[in-house]
């Protein structure tokens, strides 16, 4: 188990991982706060934050190498440049993921023997919203995703903003709202998007889900259909050009809102936790809480590695003078 906690005047940062029933943790997580300017000539810098979560593919070899490679490339891309929002279009993140993909593919071919290696990737980058050249008090969140690791936005009771492009919306039993921003790159989600799944009652009374897509047709019992969510149609490290497959979503975080990244080992059973949104937004030791949830999920039968990271927005933002060299 690996955990992290950091709190500043701007953000609370947490993450937690658990091996599950595996001997190797193929998940990798990165989280950090840094500084950003609105333009190259700006004399002030503002707080920003990033978290990255990668789930190395358990069905492929060396998933831990693949996930850590993506983390390293995204981290180095952000740390290696003092980002200004005037020029930022997300390409720096996409390029880093594509470069990591190239490294993983090259590594897989070393020694003349092809070895399959891959990973999911979800990145959340938070930076100040600029209105008429000044910080508005809200944060823009840019999310980049490929695979089935998820990004959720958690809304405080005072938050008025709702994402227009959320994949799904919900509330926990306390009334706290959350939005899932990312679409899973899974076969199940693909069939759902294509409206290819219908519920059918067979003559013997058995209930099945019929998948009909082009020339393919098959009936699945509920447990079989659920397994399709683990069949990925896109990830890092399997094909040469992945940049066009990377989802990019933009939303807004207000003070006291939060963001959660989760591997499938963590989100599989998240809906069974009735107060998770409130507990993450309002809890003091969220990394400890995430660890408790992971142990509960394992006791309920989860076998995969489990990982989650959280960024909570605090109410103030520290502005610093910038020295341009």
Where on the chain are the PLM-derived regions?
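PP2C/PPM-type serine/threonine phosphatase catalytic domain
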Residues: 1-325
């Amino acid at each position: 188990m690996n955990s992290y906690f950091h709190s500043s005047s701007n953000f609370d940062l947490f993450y937690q991982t658990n091996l599950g029933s595996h001997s190797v943790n193929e998940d990798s997580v990165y989280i950090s706060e840094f500084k950003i300017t609105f333009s190259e000539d700006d004399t002030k810098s503002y707080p920003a934050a990033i978290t990255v979560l990668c789930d190395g593919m358990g069905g492929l070899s060396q998933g831990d190498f693949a996930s850590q490679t993506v983390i390293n490339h995204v981290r180095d891309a952000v740390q290696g440049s003092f980002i200004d929002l005037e020029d930022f279009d997300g390409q720096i993140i996409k390029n880093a993921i594509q470069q990591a993909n190239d490294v993983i593919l090259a590594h897989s071919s070393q020694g003349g023997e092809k070895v399959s290696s891959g990973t999911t990737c979800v990145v959340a980058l938070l930076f100040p919203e600029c209105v008429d050249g000044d910080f508005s008090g809200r944060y823009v969140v840019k999310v980049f995703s490929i695979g089935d690791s998820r990004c959720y936005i958690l809304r405080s009771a005072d938050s008025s903003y709702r994402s227009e492009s959320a994949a799904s919306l919900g509330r926990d039993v306390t009334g706290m709202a959350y939005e899932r921003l990312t679409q899973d790159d899974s076969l199940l989600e693909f069939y759902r998007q294509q409206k290819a799944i219908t519920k059918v009652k067979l003559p013997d009374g058995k209930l099945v889900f019929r998948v009909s897509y082009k020339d393919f047709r098959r009936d699945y019992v509920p447990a079989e259909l659920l397994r399709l969510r683990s069949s990925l149609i896109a990830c890092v490290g399997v094909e040469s050009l992945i940049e066009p497959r990377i989802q990019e979503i933009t939303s807004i975080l207000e003070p006291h809102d939060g963001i959660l990244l989760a591997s499938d080992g963590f989100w599989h059973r998240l809906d069974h936790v009735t107060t998770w949104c409130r507990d993450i937004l309002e809890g003091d030791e969220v990394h400890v809480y995430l660890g408790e949830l992971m142990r509960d999920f394992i006791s309920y039968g989860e076998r995969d590695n489990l990982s989650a990271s959280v960024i909570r927005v605090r109410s103030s933002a520290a502005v610093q003078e910038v020295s341009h060299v």
